[in-house]
Amino acid sequence: MADENPQAQGAEGGGKGKSSSMRLQERHQQLRKRGRTPPSAYARRDMNETAQQHNRNESSNRSPSPLAPPRSPSPDAQARKRKRPGGGARMGLVDRETLRRRQEERERSQQEEAMRFSQNRGVTDIVRHHYNAVPQRGREWRKTESKIKGLRSFNNWIKSTLIQKFSPDEEFVARSIGTKDWADETAPPPMEDKRLLVVDLGCGKGGDLGKWQLAPQPVDLYVGLDPAEVSIVQARERYNGMRTGRGPRGRRGPLFHAEFAPKDCFGEYLGDVPIVQQVGIDPNAGPGGSVMSSRWGGGGFDVVASMFTIHYAFESEEKARQMLRNVAGCLKKGGRFLGVCPNSDIISARVAEMNAKRKERETAAKKEEAEPEDGEVEEDDNKIEWGNSIYRVRFSGDTPEDGIFRPPFGWKYSYFMEEAVEEIPEYVVPWEAFRALTEDYNLELQYRKPFLEVWKDEKDDQELGPLSERMGVRDRNTGALLMTEEEKEAASFYHAFCFYKV
């Protein structure tokens, strides 16, 4: 589920939502500078580097510099080596034993680190190979032949809702509603054309590019990172199609500058990605960083997005903390971390319920006669599985009797989604443990809701409501949600969230 393809978000609106949608679009346009928008500074950087390289390659008409005078020969190298004799003889047995123990400790530490790295790469490689192998399907197929077209459209609308609600900064939101809550009277005037810097962790095939193009506050730079190399190639092709007019660009100004790179965003530090390094990433984010860095430091990005991906980070505490170091390190103060992931409340309730049923069967000694309920498959005592014809969740190992996952890391299950995910390992993200962990990285929870509650709250919004009709989520005439009951059950497995960097 790391990559959902967009529906026709930029298509013409209609029906009862057209006038309100147009008014909001006009309001957003009034907040932007009129006239030609200058290109992104990051796009100009590429052009400047090309020009500088060209200038460096031009032939010069200057006279050659005179040769430097010859230097006196250096003394013989052997003469420079001075070693006090007898040093080794004075090393006592205790010192030799100490050195031997230290060497053994270093070797043991290196072996343990190599083992952890190998284990981490094992799951990462499985996920990467899976998404590299997912076929690229066209929009027409998704709209007509897909078995989960309602779920695809709904998931895309949820992500669009997050971007619409939480990607703008406080200054932009305050100006859009005509207040000055963003500053006191002594503050300088606002930047009329301030644009967002966004990094997308697990960008997949670039399915959210169109959503960012339609963000209320314009995007200046989009950085897409994903461990799957094939997905990065396809994301770059999708973006190039938008640049040349072959892809959906909507009607909201010029296309932002975008850069893509293959990267394990949870197992590795992002500071070695050139564009991330250029925008700014704080290497001291989180526990262990300096007091001044935690108070005043930060990265250069306004938004970090992670759609359907953070569950891969909960393989271990080390990976979860590396993920949060990357998120907090990239964000400036006031920046937003938004995304979607499996809802641990749903998982915990299912696990507790099925463990209780298993215990009842054991007590009654009628396990052979018991019939599984709809959507449940029971092959042995330890395996817990549920789902329907389009999705399936399966725990092969032991699970907590009460459904409370302690410790919060390493609870692996396999997940299947028709046409999207083929039985790959994922990990439970126990929400309260995750929220507590984010506090170590100066991230404060602002929003968290299950997918179906997001729909209930936002379906009548003056902009998001008409957007749901344009995206094929709701029937224009009846207002009905265009998903089957099985698709609704699959959607209920997820929730959306947003944190602020404080």
Curated annotation (Swiss-Prot):
Site, as annotated: mRNA cap binding: 205, 211, 238, 311, 426, 494
Start-end of Acidic residues biased regions: 370-381
One annotated GO molecular function: mRNA 5'-cap (guanine-N7-)-methyltransferase activity
GO cellular component entries: nucleus
Any Pfam family hit: mRNA_G-N7_MeTrfase
Residues covered by region (Disordered): 1-118, 360-381
Catalytic activity entry: a 5'-end (5'-triphosphoguanosine)-ribonucleoside in mRNA + S-adenosyl-L-methionine = a 5'-end (N(7)-methyl 5'-triphosphoguanosine)-ribonucleoside in mRNA + S-adenosyl-L-homocysteine
Family named by the database record: Belongs to the class I-like SAM-binding methyltransferase superfamily. mRNA cap 0 methyltransferase family.
Ranges where the mRNA cap 0 methyltransferase domain occurs: 146-502
Protein name, as recorded: mRNA cap guanine-N(7) methyltransferase
UniProt keywords, alphabetically: Methyltransferase, mRNA capping, mRNA processing, Nucleus, RNA-binding, S-adenosyl-L-methionine, Transferase
